[in-house]
Amino acid sequence: MQCVLLAAGYATRLYPLTENMPKALLKLGDKTILEMVTDKIDEVSDVENIYIVTNEKFYKQFEKWCESYKGPKKVKVINDHTTSNDNRLGAIGDLKYVIDTENINDEILVMASDNIFDFSLCDFVDMYRSKNADMICAHTIENKEDFMTLLHGMLINESVYMPVLHVTLPFI
């Protein structure tokens, strides 16, 4: 099994914070979001390699991060050569790009590089193995109050981000 981490977005909604830093490399406490994700992937013995697909703008930053990775997996950063939102490939395009350039002919665990989660991927992969079927991992938000937005001292009762889609990757 191979793992593809999607990291080719430009995170424009978080500007200026992410204007010169990819979202996955932002630190939460003493770890980057990407470290939190790779820690979870490292627990999955089935995963042999991690491919991080990114863009031209952030490629060198991911390469630098990769040099400091101390986990058990082989990690490779792949540049999709896009330079802006206007010419980006999108998630499916980037996945195809990695499959084609790396000649992957194996099961693939596809994940966003910037989603934080606290569950083990091992049970998810075990379920995939037992069902022998493609799987998508989703998470129900029980307490939507945790996702309210505070704006200028006023509480906004509902903040909807990507309204219809309440899915947390990874998926196989």
Give the predicted meaning of each segment:
Residues 1-18, 25:
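N-proximal low-complexity "stem/linker" segments adjacent to membrane-targeting elements
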Residues 2-5, 13, 31-110, 116, ...:
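Conserved N-terminal catalytic core of the sugar/cofactor nucleotidyltransferase
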Residues 20-24, 68-70, 125-129:
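Glycine-rich, phosphate-binding/catalytic loops in enzymes
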Residues 20-36:
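Short catalytic helix/loop segments, enriched in acidic residues and glycine
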Residues 23-27, 82-86, 171:
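A short acidic, glycine-rich active-site loop
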Residues 29, 79-81, 139, 165:
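Residues at the C-termini of beta-strands that transition into short coil/loop
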Residues 118-172:
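Conserved core of the sugar-phosphate nucleotidyltransferase
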